[in-house]
Amino acid sequence: MAVESTMLELGTKAPDFTLHDVVSGRTYTPEAFERNKAFLVMFICNHCPYVKLIKEDLVEYASDYMPKGVGIVAISSNDIENYPEDAPDKMKEDAEEFGYPFPYLFDKEQEAAHAYKAACTPDLFLFDENQELYYRGQFDSARPKNDIEPTGEDLRDATDRLLAGEPAPEKQIPSMGCNIKWKKGNEPAWYG
């Protein structure tokens, strides 16, 4: 089911998490990115067509902006009992196949997804150097079957503005994608 992001309030401090990278095994928290000029948290997964469409472009974005001081993590929060293609071993395969230059973290208990009010994959949260929410919205207007090529223009524009010290874009279009696959009984109030 395709849903839009919840549009967390701008200025919100980056919610805390402690999650493991499925490739390196390292533990990451937002604190690890406090010295970055910006911090991007991306809720993604392996199976969703909305994410599959932009995977290569996410890597290109990361390759362009990580050297400019943007810290990036991707998080998968899906219920792996019902969606085994999103399990950590499959996440690792996906990260290696696409050459993710950022950590791909597994949110087994779905606590990070709850804290960020993540609703869909992809769901993107760009924080400033103080880890206050600057942009939450779509990567770009590309969707499966709409014949628009992914470019990441919305996220790129927001990131460029942030790095230039400009105000956040006034128009922020919600991200759209597959709903987070919540464990039975763990669905948040904003779901469904």
Briefly describe each language-model feature range:
Residues 1-172, 179, 186-192:
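Chalcogenol-based redox active-site neighborhoods
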